[in-house]
Amino acid sequence: MSSGAKEGGGGSPAYHLPHPHPHPPQHAQYVGPYRLEKTLGKGQTGLVKLGVHCITGQKVAIKIVNREKLSESVLMKVEREIAILKLIEHPHVLKLHDVYENKKYLYLVLEHVSGGELFDYLVKKGRLTPKEARKFFRQIVSALDFCHSYSICHRDLKPENLLLDEKNNIRIADFGMASLQVGDSLLETSCGSPHYACPEVIKGEKYDGRRADMWSCGVILFALLVGALPFDDDNLRQLLEKVKRGVFHMPHFIPPDCQSLLRGMIEVEPEKRLSLEQIQKHPWYLGGKHEPDPCLEPAPGRRVAMRSLPSNGELDPDVLESMASLGCFRDRERLHRELRSEEENQEKMIYYLLLDRKERYPSCEDQDLPPRNDVDPPRKRVDSPMLSRHGKRRPERKSMEVLSITDAGGGGSPVPTRRALEMAQHSQRSRSVSGASTGLSSSPLSSPRSPVFSFSPEPGAGDEARGGGSPTSKTQTLPSRGPRGGGAGEQPPPPSARSTPLPGPPGSPRSSGGTPLHSPLHTPRASPTGTPGTTPPPSPGGGVGGAAWRSRLNSIRNSFLGSPRFHRRKMQVPTAEEMSSLTPESSPELAKRSWFGNFISLDKEEQIFLVLKDKPLSSIKADIVHAFLSIPSLSHSVLSQTSFRAEYKASGGPSVFQKPVRFQVDISSSEGPEPSPRRDGSGGGGIYSVTFTLISGPSRRFKRVVETIQAQLLSTHDQPSVQALADEKNGAQTRPAGAPPRSLQPPPGRPDPELSSSPRRGPPKDKKLLATNGTPLP
């Protein structure tokens, strides 16, 4: 069970327990009453740290989201995840307690479970017995049944998103890809991980999110029983083709009745695929009913009375904000009309569920907080004056912190009047359903980057519209986020009354950034400030020359889709030095894999630039794809018309010790949206910048891979002056004419025969995949 206490409590308990640590650290950081301690992991949207309540000692997991480094669309996904977690209360779903925020960060206070990921459990233990696998499977199905009953589809089920508590019970986490599927509508966005995604999602067709979750459950059950995945390949294109065909090897040691269940769940035709109801009636699923386990009992459903709202009745603004963040209730007029109708409908069910949650777990200002000297301390999202079910406004709760503030300012002198005014203004602007949406889509706090995700409501569904067209058959992949740019149906959400910047001082101090060491065509990005830690950060909206380049080059780096095979991967455990980190800026880049998806470094980028002149965009793209295909063990996918994602896995040696290199390639015009025509009149030429951004993996190997690609790009177009321009841009010395690129000169003792400018003939030798019992799988 969770170590968390009652959810969303509106203040400290009436009793006081002795402090769990008699001598707390002098410079401890706090989020409300929670003291930040070791780093639990690092996710694609931020860090996850352990929080300990300063009075009760309650442990929580605090997900820290840096709003300044993420685009508006990513922040919208975080807000949607918050709203969805408010709808779900189930013993096998990770709970959300509260939400805190300041000018720079968003803090999600989540239930803390100590067992880690099911992924790591499989790495450590290997394939499970049918009895243990059935226990996990039934808990997953129970939680999914509850989610689907409220039209919530997870869409990213995999062992990395399944957590274990201290009693080895399942908690489903990471609802960042989840969506509401209203009525009989279908979803469109291709998302998830290729190993666990169903064929219709891979093909880019409209799909039923509930059926897609069933396919993922079947793949997970297969992994629990076999210790390997039913569909696996080093090449992403080959992997997707295997998933489309749906043909896999069924090991003989799987019980016969379980084999029939697996075949029914891993079924290519969605109409023939087993539903949740059919799974729960299957003989193998029912075979464990006699096994005593109180955690397998079905959770009681939340029943709320759905009454008709009077035409002149007032609707709860917090609930409406949460519904807007779900993505499928953005038409306010239609939403109000459905809420006031006499018939029961989806809108009324969601409205009253959120209102019921707000009434049972009111979010009020914290009391008895520890002394804080922060310039901009995190503040709790609190409720606006609540409405009764008959539309009458209730008196607002106020805490002593708002009425009499005695916090010290940045210089250490108390300024109670000023701080009280700031807190009162903030509490008026940041009210929500105990952590529901605050309309961050139009906040100037968000990054000025061009959005990477597409958010456009489907007709009657809470799913993002798919933009940029379907990927080609050669490079088809499943973007876990929408492609850059978007379809014609995209539109930003309506502006929110709470989308103004949070009041407060200019910002918090940041860690210092060191001066990067320049190497040819390689520029690691320094910290956002580049100044000592006592200097306040610049204004998010401020900029100097080259702001367009910075916003372009600092675009969000989505994690490469797919999961490392747990039967080949060694469990990663952070060191004691990594776990002692307290601040988000100083947290380790190699911390343990987080609970919240695939990981990237948000604090530091490694980028390589290449400038090409007088070449059309189509020719540059063709040359890049040709370079990708000429390097063995390199797979790639198309994110948009000007963006690629690639992964290189070096062959030779045990793969468990080899970390793949994942990077993104972006093409941007240096002359604006309309490049000048070519001299020969063919048009389409201009100056283009090709940016290679490292996502994960060894930096040295990343440089060699990119320089190999660079050598092929430059060999197709003789432009020494442009090469010199690229070297000058990256602060490197110009390479003498005729000198070979560094990619063709591997370092001593570390030969890399696969990185050569000429493609190797013939495919690489296939490797036999070994199951955990040591038998080769065909």
From Swiss-Prot:
Q: How is its activity regulated?
A: Activated by phosphorylation on Thr-189 by STK11/LKB1.
Tissues expressed in: Widely expressed, with highest levels in brain and testis. Protein levels remain constant throughout the cell cycle.
Q: A Pfam family this protein belongs to?
A: UBA_BRSK
Where are the Phosphothreonine residues found in this chain? T189, T529, T535, T583
What top-tier enzyme class does this entry carry? transferase
The record's active-site residues are: D156
Q: Which cofactors must be present for this protein to function? A: Mg(2+)
Name used for this protein in its record: Serine/threonine-protein kinase BRSK1
This chain's source organism reads Homo sapiens (Human)
